[in-house]
Amino acid sequence: MGKKYVIGIDYGTESGRAVLVDLEGNEIADHVTPYPHGVIDEVLPESNVQLEPDWALQHPGDYIEVLATAVPAVLQKSGVNPADVIGVGIDFTACTMLPIAGSGEPLCLKPEFKHRPHSWVKLWKHHAAQDEANLLNEMAAKRGEAFLPRYGGKISSEWMIAKIWQILNEDPDIYDQTDLFLEATDWVIFKMTGQLVRNSCTAGYKSIWHKQDGYPSKEFFRALDPRLEHVTETKLRGSIVPLGTRAGVLTKEMAAMMGLLPGTAVAVGNVDAHAAVPGVGVVEPGKMVMAMGTSICHMLLGTEEKYVEGMCGVVEDGIIPGYFGYEAGQSAVGDIFAWYVEQSVPAYVKEAAEKEGVSVHEWLEKRAAAYRPGETGLLALDWWNGNRSVLVDTDLTGLIIGYTLLTKPEEIYRALLEATAFGTRKIIDAFVESGINVDELYACGGLPQKNKLLMQIYADVTNREIKIAASKQTPAVGAAMFAAVAAGKENGGYESIIEAARNMGKVREETFKPIPENVAIYEQLYQEYTKLHDYFGRGENDVMKRLKHWKETARAVKESISLS
């Protein structure tokens, strides 16, 4: 048997990337395909339909474009014979969901529905279902539902049930016309194989499904809304299969589009962050993996099911078979830094960066690195896109305290970096307080590759050594590992994801170790962060929510005046 390869495809927020990997984990070729429609958060494509605040949609055709463009590109770059590619795996943002017709076609691609916002793909960071999430949490708490503690006491507006309920409330006809609500990762697998299966990872973390208990009861859904009573057996029906399972094989049509052979094994869909865990070789407890990009997803393995405040979920076999997989997260990290650079940095900084031939981020990082912890005099709350963990509240907003007339852009930039590190520390503390050890940190994604200052701050704030993924595209490599498992040992792949991870997972030799004097200062700053966190986030002062309410009211008045 000659040398064999697998392909992993990582569907991110703005683009999809394919990586061709050998069975030792060496990356042979990769290609990034930006989504032609990007994130749709203002106006629907091909119409002038304006979207409300907190909406975030996508075009499902963009996902197929990635298959048609990125996969042939890596084959061409590498010169690898398609016959030597034994499997394909994908990972996706989640919960990114869409309504499909009985034919499997997304409703938004039908001419009669394309002007209806609720027919489109709802991206993970669509936060307009917060009202539904609030009511769902109130009802679950009132009824003492057993599932609630598994999700840190709150179900997020980002997840499947809240999004489905929003559709039912705001456009019941779309709900009625929908045959199935699917995670985008499962829909792409369906397009590739013709097989409709749901993966246990998104079902468990995003759709309140439990390996032993299944979905919440019909009685619970009836108490929420009588129209939802049968939602799990109708709109969410379908086989739920574990990670590492073969979903099917490439159809002739999709194989031709992708430049591969019909019959190539396709792994069950996965979540981007979760695929990264084996991607860095982590297959045992005590090692937290941080997938760091526009947001952060924190993942940890355990040997038993425990309840942790504000975690996104604990799912048996949800990350690595044989372990309970814990997930927590921060709703915005890289997005905060990007917002600052794009919206708030003065012109002279951009001009100086251009003159030096560096990006604005690099210019700010270099200058921010000259400051000692505490030297900026600033402290921030990292809630520009709400708080996912531990407060689970998308109505919270960002805050910076300590401004003076002498405050410089690089000081603000550093304060934002530090704020996200404090947010991660808050998550680590929640796990440790619940009896789940966090001994080592692993980081992957775009941020650890680009920003050394950020990683040193995280090491200092958490007082833990951080190991960095060797790959710049760890989720795609992880997806490729699952492809190797789907292909099976008999075809040159692996028997289990643990075996694949031990042979294919890689980290850099360079690590970030905490600096004791920095740790001591950050400990004091973290105590102040905690006071602000609890004051604004736990109900003592709901000013952020009131401001958001007044903003929405003012906008509504303004729109009604413009329409009259």
Swiss-Prot record:
SUPFAM superfamilies: Actin-like ATPase domain (SSF53067). It comes from the Bacteria. The keyword Kinase applies. This is Ribulokinase. Belongs to the ribulokinase family. One of its GO terms (cellular component) is cytoplasm. GO terms for molecular function: ATP binding; D-ribulokinase activity; ribulokinase activity. It comes from Anoxybacillus flavithermus (strain DSM 21510 / WK1). It is an enzyme of class 2 (transferase). Transmembrane segments: none annotated. It catalyses: D-ribulose + ATP = D-ribulose 5-phosphate + ADP + H(+); L-ribulose + ATP = L-ribulose 5-phosphate + ADP + H(+).
